[in-house]
């Protein structure tokens, strides 16, 4: 009788554990169709840009009220970042797209200043505070050089983005695969198509990321 009771208890707890593990984890981030998207435009002079401006226009047209675009060149021409305003913008975002041209194998100075000021003040030595835990970062990069220039045996685009990736991963953000386009120069006769295809890749990545997160794989 005692043996039967013990077997029953073991089976009960095993079954209960399986039931719990099959339930959705309430702490998992589930990106809805209404996910909030924040774009940080790091181009130092967007008015003179063709590719970056076209990409932002397509994003705004596609997402409408779901998207908020912060043009750093317009907001901070003197490079004096309003840290509190930027943190407020970040607070409710699910996706943060860093849109910028690759300058000397890195981000433009204005975007770097934004990262330095906003993240430093946000964490104040407590980088594991979890404030970025449920946010996905997408580096959306336009590159003036050719695809061959950034293919092996040369260094790849991903290599140049490692410092950016490490920065956001160390504070707990999700780092999505970067989206980048080559030959993003005015002399490219197909620049409009290049910008549009870049936009399409961004949409595909966001949808893929939502699907992955919903499955608990993020």
Regions found by a protein language model. Give the residues of each.
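Bacterial Sec-dependent N-terminal signal peptides
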Residues: 1-27
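N-terminal beta1-alpha1 ligand-phosphate binding loop
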Residues: 27-65
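Glycine-rich phosphate/pyrophosphate-binding loop and the adjoining helix
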Residues: 31-36, 57-60, 163-218
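Residue-level recognition of beta-strand->loop/alpha-helix junctions
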Residues: 41, 71-73, 179-180
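A short beta-strand-loop structural module common to alpha/beta enzyme folds
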Residues: 65-78
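Structural motif
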Residues: 76-84, 187-194
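Helix-loop-strand module that forms the ligand-binding subsite of alpha/beta enzymes
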Residues: 84-165
């Amino acid at each position: 009788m005692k043996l039967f009771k013990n077997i029953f208890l073991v089976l009960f707890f095993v079954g209960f554990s399986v039931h719990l593990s099959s339930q959705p984890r309430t702490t998992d981030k589930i990106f809805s169709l209404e996910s909030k998207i924040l774009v940080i435009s790091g181009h130092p002079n967007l008015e003179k840009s063709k590719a970056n401006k076209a990409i932002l226009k397509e994003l705004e047209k596609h997402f409408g009220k779901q998207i908020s675009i912060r043009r750093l060149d317009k907001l901070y021409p003197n490079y004096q970042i309003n840290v509190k305003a930027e943190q407020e913008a970040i607070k409710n975002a699910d996706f943060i797209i860093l849109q910028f041209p690759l300058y000397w194998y890195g981000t433009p100075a204005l975007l770097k200043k934004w990262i330095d000021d906003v993240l430093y003040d946000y964490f104040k030595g407590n980088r594991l505070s979890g404030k970025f835990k449920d946010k996905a970062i997408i580096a959306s990069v336009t590159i003036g050089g050719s695809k061959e220039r950034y293919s092996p045996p040369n260094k790849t685009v991903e290599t140049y983005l490692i410092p950016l990736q490490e920065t956001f991963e160390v504070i707990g953000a999700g780092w999505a695969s970067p989206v980048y386009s080559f030959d993003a120069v005015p002399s490219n006769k197909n620049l409009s198509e290049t910008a549009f295809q870049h936009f399409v890749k961004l949409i595909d990545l966001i949808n893929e990321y939502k699907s992955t997160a919903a499955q608990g794989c993020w």
